[in-house]
Amino acid sequence: MTTPAPARPTERPIPSPFTGAGKLWRATFLSHILNPWNMAFALLLPMFMYAMFGMTDVARATQTGRGNLAAAMIAMMTTYGVILVGGSLGATLSVERTTGISRMYALTPIQPWVILLVRLTALVALSAFITLITFSFGMATGAQMTAGAWAASAAVVIALSALGALIGLACGYTIKGENAYSASAFVMLMGAFVSGMFIPLDQLPPFVAQIAPFTPLYGAVQAIYAVAGTVTMPTAAWLNIAGWAVVTAGIAWWGASHDTDR
């Protein structure tokens, strides 16, 4: 009588942490670009604001260091659009937490850092898409800058979308449900007004100029002014960007750790 040999455990290759990353990237990109409300605020609103203030003879005739004022305006409005997209993408995490999607990710091979990388690359693609359309609209309607200034402005605008994503992440990890979208949009709208994104600070009440350097979007506004050649980038603007990036990233990290422990 022979004794059957014990069955060997099935050897399966360890799946790649990038398994499903491509599908997640496409889903993330399409869910935002095909959302009419997202595109209305991120694309149509900046062009409408530019049309109101930038498509004037004064804006076309006023020269900055690297172009005209109309070009600086389209770059500024585009920045607001991509920051809104970044905030929306970051706040999406809140909805995923409340619906249980984030826990479903934990059952798949894809790693959390890969999910973050996918979201960031999708944000870059979305920001580049918005920037291409709005800058083309600006060029066709009298906005003028040197080729180098257009390229530098586009790079800065796309990079600043990460600030919106950090604000959205901070809201998404600390505020439950779809309220995170409202909170993120509120922070950005108020920040845009107080930082001089829509109306220059010298045309606002004096107290606004005093608190502006401490608001989330002040550094972004100054960065656009600097790349357009209207002003030099002040030290306070660099500190503003770095400080708010650290604060929002810290809040998001704390929220992510708390969510993982739970």
Where do the protein language model's features map onto the residues?
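Residues that define the loop-to-transmembrane-helix transition and helix capping
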Residues: P36-W37, A71, W113, E178, ...
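Short helix-loop-helix connector
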Residues: A106, I110, T141, I175, ...
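Short hydrophobic, aromatic-rich alpha-helical segments embedded in or entering the lipid bilayer
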Residues: T2-P4, P13-L24, I199-W238
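Transmembrane helix-boundary elements of multi-pass transport/secretion proteins
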Residues: P13-G20, L24-T99, S127, A143, ...
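Alpha-helical transmembrane segments and their short interhelical loops
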Residues: P112-L189, T232-W253
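Transmembrane helix-loop junction
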Residues: S31, G54-V58, M139, A143, ...
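Helix-loop-helix units of permease transmembrane domains in multi-pass membrane transporters
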Residues: T92-V124
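Transmembrane helix segments
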Residues: M52-A59, T174-F214, Y218
